[in-house]
Amino acid sequence: VRVSGDGGNYRNTTTSATLPFMSAAAEIHSPPPIPAFRLSSFYFAYYAALGAFTPYWALFLKHRGMDVAAISILMSLWYATRIIAPTTWTTIAARSPRPIRWLRIGCALTLASFAAFVLPMQFTGLFAGMVLFCFAYNAVMPQFEAITLSHLPGRSERYGRIRVWGSIGFILVVAGFGPLLDGIGIGALPWLMLPLFLMLLGSAAITDYARAVD
């Protein structure tokens, strides 16, 4: 940048040689882009599946022949695993050289364990399946929240616009699955939920922690 004078009038002039350096400096100090679509798609899939599970799963268990006592035990596993799964999973991930791998493992276990529910099962099989499924499903969200926040240093106002897609997915499924299941039967619930868990795994596969910026 030069300062030149002409008849007492001074102005700043930028030479072409300085432009590359100014551009490089701007790139160094500009924050990396936020992968909003990838982050939003995970929230959408996770809470869309939750929108199917929360109101309709007990009805599915009743359809499978479970009585009220059995349903209460099976549904309690969802809340019991919420106590231990997040802490256990995030601790394992934090000690791993590649913590993102554990998010993907958790989503794969969620999909695989849930897929077993399309098979005919008695109480013992349903109990074992629910333990594994609920543990994996409850484990992944706290880790994903950490991933989301790693992309938002100094830009926390963007969190709400990303997280809202979880609420949208939940509302769409809760409202849409009711009439759909009335028409095709509650027995189809696992088949309707499987694509949502597949979407969850796909989103985890393309998501990672933000890279550290020097």
Role assignments for model-derived ranges:
Residues 28-82:
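Helix-loop boundary and gating motifs at the non-cytosolic
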Residues 79-87, 170-171, 175:
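Residue-level signature of mid-helix packing/kink "hotspots" within the transmembrane helices
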Residues 84-98, 181-182:
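Helix-to-loop junctions at the C-terminal end of transmembrane segments
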Residues 97, 119-124, 207:
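Helix-breaking motifs and short loop linkers at transmembrane-helix boundaries and internal kinks
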Residues 101-115:
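Structural signature of the two symmetry-related core transmembrane helices
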Residues 205-214:
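Flexible cytoplasmic inter-helical loops of multi-pass small-molecule transporters
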